[in-house]
From Swiss-Prot:
The protein's Enzyme Commission number: 5.2.1.8
PPIase cyclophilin-type domain span: 55-225
Gene Ontology annotations of biological process type: protein folding
Compartments it resides in: Membrane
Pfam families xref list: Pro_isomerase
Protein topology in the membrane: Single-pass membrane protein
Keywords: Glycoprotein, Isomerase, Membrane, Rotamase, Signal, Transmembrane, Transmembrane helix
Signal peptide limits: 1-20
Entry protein name: Peptidyl-prolyl cis-trans isomerase CPR4
Reactions catalysed: [protein]-peptidylproline (omega=180) = [protein]-peptidylproline (omega=0)
PANTHER family the record matches: PEPTIDYL-PROLYL CIS-TRANS ISOMERASE, PEPTIDYL-PROLYL CIS-TRANS ISOMERASE CPR4-RELATED
Function comment: PPIases accelerate the folding of proteins. It catalyzes the cis-trans isomerization of proline imidic peptide bonds in oligopeptides.
Transmembrane residue ranges: 286-303
Length: 318
């Protein structure tokens, strides 16, 4: 009887594991980005830098780091870029209503990535979790403009909490064909220019709960930022806006592509494949289901063996 009960329990477990396994639908990765597609020209960069993201690798069961280079567009959204750049460097501040000698440094360094939505964006950058919304202008600041569009992957943009409600939080988009649904809501202020494969192939598929909260440590570890000193920046911006108007009027010849953005890193092995989630992780639901099936099969063999009638062979001598 105990074997029958065990078999029933294992059968139920197998059903649960198979039901919990992800579908075999194709995941969107860096390979799905059309590198030849023409986009609006990019503004002249006023800042360049590197963001280091620390994330949990489910294959090696260890923490890894990904370096993403980026550029900021201060000629288009100077106020938004200034807020991001200052928090990347770190600012000293005294919170209103508290001891004026109680000075704290607030920066993006080691802040958590608190939301991850595959094929949409990752979001983080809460610099003062014990205080509340924080910017270099006060708790919040208004939307500057929506001139730059979410027309391509890896846009740097402000996290959306409603009109004119920008805080320190920002997003990095991961949708292969752009997040046009965010146009007119989230202010774009920059672009990731390398490290896109790690972001799109691994980081955006980190394990989360039903609300998009990462199940393992995921954070912006370091920021390195450089202000570019360009003497003719105003002339470059004027030439840029002229090209944008031509592009929006149908002249795609002035557009730019993403062909040179993706870096060629042969040492990096993506965690996902073109057919879906990898299943060689022992904690993966499919792997657990296969192990359950194996145990189920062994139990069945044992059960069958115990109930088979023995075959008696006579060894008597005549």
């Amino acid at each position: 009887m105990w074997l029958k009960s065990l078999l029933l329990c294992l059968y139920s477990l197998v059903l649960c594991q198979v039901h919990a396994a992800p579908s075999s639908g194709k995941q969107i990765t860096s390979k799905d980005v059309d590198l030849q597609k023409k986009y609006e020209p990019s503004p002249p960069a006023t800042h360049r830098g590197i963001i280091t993201i620390e994330y949990f690798d489910p294959v090696s069961k260890s923490m890894k780091e990904a370096d993403l280079t980026f550029e900021l567009y201060g000629t288009v959204v100077p106020k938004t870029v200034n807020n991001f750049a200052m928090l990347a460097h770190g600012v000293k501040a005294v919170i209103e209503g508290k001891d004026p000698n109680d000075i704290h440094t607030y920066s993006y360094r080691k802040t958590k990535i608190n939301k991850v939505y595959p094929n949409k964006y990752i979001q983080g950058g809460v610099v003062a979790p014990d205080v509340g919304p924080f910017t270099v202008y006060g708790p919040k600041f208004d939307d500057e403009n929506f001139y730059l569009k979410h027309d391509r992957p890896e846009r740097l943009a402000m996290a959306y909490f409603g009109p004119d409600s920008n805080t320190s939080e920002f997003i990095i988009t991961t949708k292969a064909d752009g997040n046009e649904e965010l146009d007119g809501k989230s202010v774009v202020f920059g672009q990731i220019t390398s490290g896109l494969d790690q972001l799109m192939d691994a980081i955006q598929y980190t394990e989360t709960d039903e609300y998009g909260k990462p199940q393992h440590e995921l954070r912006f570890l370091y920021f390195v930022l450089e202000i570019l000193k360009i003497s003719n920046i105003l002339d470059l911006h004027a030439a840029y806006t002229e090209k944008v108007e031509k592009f929006r009027n149908g002249d795609v010849s002035v557009g730019s592509t993403l062909e040179n953005i993706f870096r060629n890193d042969k040492a990096y092995t993506p965690l996902t494949t073109s057919t879906g989630t990898t299943a060689y992780d022992l904690n993966h639901p499919i792997s657990r289901a296969l192990m359950c099936l194996t145990v189920l099969g062994l139990c069945f063999i044992a059960y069958k063996g115990m109930h088979e009638k023995p075959h008696t062979v006579s060894l008597r001598h005549k």
